[in-house]
């Protein structure tokens, strides 16, 4: 593209950069599309692993960026985004623990902060025009920095396939580790990894062993169960097997332990925000254990009405997080409403891991409402069973009146 036909009005743009095929192509495309535009690469370290970050700065510079900021967000992600979300019990369509969805708000927020720091007038992402992430990122940008221009190359350029991107980079002598044989689209963070694309797009194809990366196949997991002891304080895991750990530290340990037992795999066809269905294979080993532990203590400490309210919050929260509406008054309100309930979730849980399953087999809490004296079927001095008669008569009064009226 000649200088005469290049777009103007953008002098400095911050790109959400991963070093993958898409964002590697975006850097030269931005330089060729916008006149005299400086590209700043931004990478969020959300626990995707050292292999994903190694050499990233050099790669961004060699692709044409003037600078690359790598921001460590691991602890903040777990403490300020994951824990508040799972405290509500949010789980999308009954199975998905929102791994990708929870990471998007903190990434977008940090990207805006870098844009402000360097004086950028635009932000850019590599999300496709068919997916949820474009909505999540741009919804966050709208809430946090409505003055910044948003550039979404997948909705602008003429490239439509991985082959197109590979050819584009080859023509410009930009190296990439991607290839047409690397068929899966993966997204990893401290909480999970997702796998999409390739043969997974046909729901009749069973995922091969090569799909999964965080967990062993349940049938190949140890033949003996492993018991993991967890201590919780106000809805957060503070100790794993007696060792005090940070929020991120606890999650990484549980990922390793639970992954070795094949825990946390799901294969689902979900309803995307943009209207289509998509198939995703997700691995959330440590998160599955954490979710089970919180729900186990909740069973002890929440009364019936509180638990029903928490379930309502969780159902609404799952949609807000999935749909990219984290920075909204409603999301803020639901998170605030869940805090008094989460503050009760303190205690100890023992989780049994075996062949892909994670079950709470022991639990106790100083806040427990469970009383063996009250619950026993044997003789007791604290509960007069005759009292139930009056309660049942009043509880069923509406049904009795309706039946009498029907005669």
From Swiss-Prot:
The keyword ATP-binding applies. L-citrulline binds at residues 96, 101, 132, 136, 185, 194, 270, 282. ATP binds at residues 16-24, 44, 126. It holds the Pfam family Arginosuc_syn_C. Homotetramer. Pathway: Amino-acid biosynthesis; L-arginine biosynthesis; L-arginine from L-ornithine and carbamoyl phosphate: step 2/3. This is Argininosuccinate synthase. It is found in: Cytoplasm. It catalyses: L-citrulline + L-aspartate + ATP = 2-(N(omega)-L-arginino)succinate + AMP + diphosphate + H(+). The gene is argG. L-aspartate binds at residues 128, 132-133. HAMAP family: Arg_succ_synth_type1. NCBIfam families: argG, PRK00509.1. Its main location: cytoplasm.
